[in-house]
Amino acid sequence: NQTEIKMMFDDKNLYVGIKVPAKSNNFIIPSLRRDFRASGNDNITLLFDTFNDGSNAFFFGTNPAGVKREALLSGGGTDLRGFNLAWDTKWVCKTQILDDAYIAEIAIPLTAFKFREGETKWRFNSYQFDTQDNEQNTWMNIPQNQYIFSLAYMGEMIFEKPLGKSRAPIAIIPYINTFSGNDFENNSSVNDVKFGGDAKFAIGNSMNLDVTINPDFSQVEVDQQITNLTRFEISLPERRQFFIENSDLFGDFGNSRDGNPFFSRRIGIAKNKNGESIENGIVAGARLSGKLNNNLRLGILSVQTEEDIANEIPATNNSVVAIQQKLFSRSNISFLFINKQATKDYNFLTREDKYNRVIGIDYNLASANNTWNGRYFIHKSFSPTVNRKDIS
């Protein structure tokens, strides 16, 4: 028996009905946590390449218990690095377990996607893990030497009428945070009110302008606790919403392990005069990112952090410009410029800490059928004390 997937859409939502046959209702569901790992349990995943570029896709999945997983997929699905599971959006998924199958009914708001106005075709694929038959099934055939989520092998999804605009033009999320405390030992009290907010503006159908003022990240999901017994830093995923969308445009340069020039998690953290990492508040930030056309992507980011004189931390501006041009069927060439610079000349600043800049070019190779893929890059760092050999 084959898995059945049927779709409908209106001006607001994409509706998906799925029936997954099975030998019995003895499904393996090891976790009810959102964004669960697909391997080793029963589940089905849908991939939508809304710009038909074979490089980026939206990813939605569920298991027989109705647990949801969604992600942004970049880099053409050539490796696991392209998954961004920190991205979340609102959508509905209900499931029912039968004796010989499970059924899923899904409604995804069209505002969750980005696409060109008037679009009539997306690229689509789905894959399913079946533990009872120990199988991995896909709608479009994918060679066994490729990842099951490869965007090189996708079918066409045709809409009966052209789609409208992909996003609401403006989204504003304000916040206010109050704090009150008493120090009975010193007979004093502390009262504090903090306010700020985030705003997202749609520019056309494929560009976003994100703005943040005095951001409050208290609602961000807590990081997984890891005991680090090595002398090396742990690289934890970015979970702050301001930095997530199109994050691959800024952070997918160099080598993810030892040659990545920009890691957004460092913004908002600084070392005090004792060399300890502490929180460094963000005053404001702006971020423009998306597609200028089907072949050219642009990202501009600027974030200002506050000064902390007591801990000898300067006010710093963090700026990034990234440009990505598509080449051939699925390859691209990217340009990156990073500038981190103290906004004033502080007495406690050493010469090497006044600024640091990086300029770089990356070429990401991905053939049409993903037989050939690779990465070539050269990056150069500039600071007051850097010599000519600081190249990666």
List the model feature ranges, each with a label.
Residues N1-K326, S331-F335:
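Structural preference for beta-rich elements and adjacent junctions enriched in aromatics
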Residues A310, D345-L349:
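Solvent-exposed loop segments that connect transmembrane elements
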Residues G281-V283, S289, K354-N356, S367-S392:
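Exposed, low-structure sequence patches enriched in small/polar residues
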Residues F217, Q341, F382:
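Feature marks short, surface-exposed loop/turn motifs that line or immediately flank catalytic pockets
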Residues E185, F348-R351:
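A generic structural signal for short
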Residues R123, N205, S319-K340, R351-I378:
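Transmembrane beta-barrel wall of Gram-negative outer-membrane proteins
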